[in-house]
Amino acid sequence: MASQGTKRSYEQMETDGERQNATEIRASVGKMIDGIGRFYIQMCTELKLSDYEGRLIQNSLTVERMVLSAFDERRNRYLEEHPSAGKDPKKTGGPIYKRVNGKWMRELVLYDKEEIRRIWRQANNGDDATRGLTHMMIWHSNLNDTTYQRTRALVRTGMDPRMCSLMQGSTLPRRSGAAGAAVKGVGTMVMELIRMIKRGINDRNFWRGENGRKTRSAYERMCNILKGKFQTAAQRAMMDQVRESRNPGNAEIEDLIFSARSALILRGSVAHKSCLPACVYGPAVASGYDFEKEGYSLVGIDPFKLLQNSQVYSLIRPNENPAHKSQLVWMACHSAAFEDLRLLSFIRGTKVCPRGKLSTRGVQIASNENMDTMESSTLELRSRYWAIRTRSGGNTNQQRASAGQISVQPTFSVQRNLPFDKSTVMAAFTGNTEGRTSDMRAEIIRMMEGAKPEEVSFRGRGVFELSDEKATNPIVPSFDMSNEGSYFFGDNAEEYDN
């Protein structure tokens, strides 16, 4: 079972999981980055993009989406079988932005999926290079996590919108594999399971027959992934209960919501990786940098160094603040949507604001938006320090937390105490400890009650100067604890809509 002693590093998940040493892992991840870079260079040639246009993040997103769609076999099969008007199942495309006579113009391009697949494979030495595709999915997911607060999705499944810090990876496609599962938050897994159980309640045949067997094994697999994220025996035992249920129903939904709430204090292990847009990797490869030879890691200094030396541009709407747009993308690049803003401000070297205070909408431009008033500007993606990404939830303690988001999910392995609003979280746990999971519930509540405010997480870990590549001199930051720590504070972020 996934959680029992088979903890693999994300790089191993990203590299087909053979046990490899650090150098092999770095080379293997580098090879994946090379492939994305080469593909992007080729696509810029196909689309006749200038250097500036190729570094435009909106063009990068369109190209990334095209290749993801070209390899989405289930959807492609579905489109073939259910032809819809005006949609060619064999083609993929999107908006490409070009600078014409001093104005930005939108051009809709359409390509054969077969052609895109050919270009992708050619850039990846003939392989399908699924890991490169997953890498782009995680970048899109991180961008969504930073841009949207999934209030509606949480409410629909019976959870509380203040639990948004558990929702990392909630927009990742099902096909994102082990690397995708590693970056999903506890709330995301709970939401997927609840949706599944609800279908089973409404559809008598969901668990039955040949298909039902597949459904059941998917259900158990998801339970095991979630179990592997929990760090306490009681939370894991609860997941065993949910997994072994003969006929999952409302009792299981209750247990899942309970375990999600408990994760606000007894945080799960969620992986974090810095996945950058293709328009960062492309120019680096074009300049002659050999990622495979030099080696690359998604969780160390490498993405920070790469961003220090990259030029990325973005379209800006008339009333948007380019600095705010930069913050949004910077947070997405480091998978830091649910990290403590005080720590982010320290690492970035400029103040990082809550989502609701940002004068910026998402990065993507809708097809009905007016291009005449669009400007473009440079995204400031550099940082003052770098820090190691974590896959642990850190341990817990109490802090004044905000109305909008009542806990954090740490991204960086840096010493601090983690803010959460204990009274708010605990208020959700009154009463209901009866039923078959009563002993586990009581145990979980006891542990949460015991979480101490003064406890420090990631003791002794610090941030590093960008010149300190080997991470030899940790700098432990000191924080002004009176500042607001959470990003989705009493917020008005847009909703994410599929």
From Swiss-Prot:
Q: Name one Pfam family in it.
A: Flu_NP
> What does the entry's PTM section describe?
Late in virus-infected cells, may be cleaved from a 56-kDa protein to a 53-kDa protein by a cellular caspase. This cleavage might be a marker for the onset of apoptosis in infected cells or have a specific function in virus host interaction.
The sequence motif named Unconventional nuclear localization signal is recorded at 1-18
Keyword Ribosomal protein in the entry? The reply is: no
Q: Recorded GO terms, molecular function?
A: RNA binding; structural molecule activity
The protein here is known as Nucleoprotein
Assembly and binders: Homomultimerizes to form the nucleocapsid. May bind host exportin-1/XPO1. Binds to viral genomic RNA. Protein-RNA contacts are mediated by a combination of electrostatic interactions between positively charged residues and the phosphate backbone and planar interactions between aromatic side chains and bases.
- Compartment(s) where it occurs, according to its Swiss-Prot or TrEMBL record: Virion; Host nucleus
Keyword list (alphabetical) reads: Capsid protein, Helical capsid protein, Host nucleus, Host-virus interaction, Ribonucleoprotein, RNA-binding, Viral nucleoprotein, Viral penetration into host nucleus, Virion, Virus entry into host cell
Q: What is this protein's function per UniProt?
A: Encapsidates the negative strand viral RNA, protecting it from nucleases. The encapsidated genomic RNA is termed the ribonucleoprotein (RNP) and serves as template for transcription and replication. The RNP needs to be localized in the host nucleus to start an infectious cycle, but is too large to diffuse through the nuclear pore complex. NP comprises at least 2 nuclear localization signals that are responsible for the active RNP import into the nucleus through cellular importin alpha/beta pathway.
Q: Does the keyword Ribonucleoprotein apply?
A: yes
Family note: Belongs to the influenza viruses nucleoprotein family.
Q: What is its main location?
A: virion
Q: Which GO terms describe its biological process?
A: symbiont entry into host cell; viral penetration into host nucleus
User: GO CC terms on record?
Assistant: helical viral capsid; host cell; host cell nucleus; ribonucleoprotein complex; viral nucleocapsid
Give the Basic and acidic residues compositional bias ranges.
Answer: 8-21
From which domain of life does this come? Viruses
The segments labelled Disordered in the record are 1-21
Disulfide linkages recorded for this protein, renumbered to the chain, are: none
Source species of the chain: Influenza A virus (strain A/Guangdong/38/1977 H3N2)
Q: Where is this motif: Bipartite nuclear localization signal?
A: 198-216
